[in-house]
Amino acid sequence: MLGLLLFSFHSQAAESLVFSNVWSPEAPPVASVMAGYFTVENKGRKEILIEEIRSPQFKSIEIHRTEHKDGMATMAWQPHVHVPAGKRVELKPGGKHLMMFKPKQAIKHGDTITLHVSLSNNTQQTIHAKVKRH
């Protein structure tokens, strides 16, 4: 019975973040970097940080934020994404986004990218990004 209760609690903690609209724009076949976007909602009562995102299809993935200064857009690395309790955060073009480096094979329109998301509550979620023409 205790094992069942622990499993139930662990599952609820992992499911307190709900991901939607997970996608990546198609890039040229020779591209060494692709972007990724999603909306995430925290259904829990405590803030959760997205601490790391990995994929078997890319060498590495970083979280970036687009900044505008003196008419120039630059990207700044972010150590994590804060998802406040009861709130929604959107990673979108021109804002926070994923930078997925060095795809291990060609990725094209219609493909799916597997993303393993590590969270500050010591859980991990796997989500899937659909590659779309943008």
What are the residue ranges of the model-derived segments?
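Sec-dependent N-terminal signal peptides
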Residues: 1-2
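Compact, glycine-rich, soluble single-domain proteins
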Residues: 15-134
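N-terminal signal peptide c-region/cleavage motif recognized by signal peptidases
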Residues: 8-11
